[in-house]
Amino acid sequence: MVRNRFLANRKSAKTAFCKEFRTMAHYNTVFHTLAKILPRHEIDRFDRKYGQGDKRRQSSRYVQFIVMLMAQILDLKSLREIEQAQKSNQKRLYHLGVKSPVSRSALSRMNDERSADFFKDVFQQMLQSCKALAPGSQFKLPGVNSLILMDATTIQLCLDVFPWATYTQTKGALKLHFGLNDDGYLPDFMVATTGKVHEINVAKSLDYQPGSMICMDRGYTDYDWWEELTRKGIYFVTRLKSNAVYDEIRRRAGRRSKNIVDDETIKLKGIQTPFRLIHYISPEDQHEYHFITNAMHLPAQTIADIYKERWQIELFFKWVNQNQKIKIFLDTSANAVMT
């Protein structure tokens, strides 16, 4: 009886080990495949840009990037695990330019002291490469160059451990602000801030190309900003808050789909620029939505379809949460977290 239990436990342990080994082997294959297609010359260029004044004996930012990429893909949870994984994969890492393992103390110091802007530049460079291969947008909108789906997601942090990441008096958080391009569903921009920074403040600080269209939720309500976008030739689509005060200028003529209740030109209180307000009944739940936009030339149903497309950024956030392993941070400083 005891022997049978021992053999069963041994078999179970062996099965678990084999499963873990196969998983690690898969992650290693993914990591090395990805590492080989990195734009090494571009990363070296950014290394030279940010590396002025570095001590000569320090590892390059390319090495730091490869080690951190390995940690992310292999789901390593501590500096000690990263150090051990480098030793286990030393031959493979050598061929990727990591000549010797980076100690955990050295890696901690790099993440804490080296500007995270290096990784922002690498991200933007790789993003441009991905965009060249991305499929086109399903929306072919006259006069609109690109459709940007805008929103933000929050990562909760312990305020005692991350005192710089203020959110409320008792909570800490990191907020990621995204602008997802409908053309391939890749981000046009990503801005990381502390949790207390409101989405509208980040949105107003960004530059948008004339002819682009921003689709966003009611958290981005700012009448003056909407007016500024209109002056610059930038379109927007969002929902009007229920307490908004406005005057109807005229009802818009033209054919409407059966789900369009009304289509009117309005003036919001305190704003001279006229906007367009569309009243829409959703066929799915029969709920009435009120869309406001400055795109006067598009059919009302198209405006409703554009706002429906905003759901794609929610799916993007869900995908990030499922695939981006942000369970722990290797250090507590703001620069290390951004890295």
What are these regions (language model features)?
Residues 87-97:
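Extended, structured, electrostatic nucleic-acid-contact surfaces
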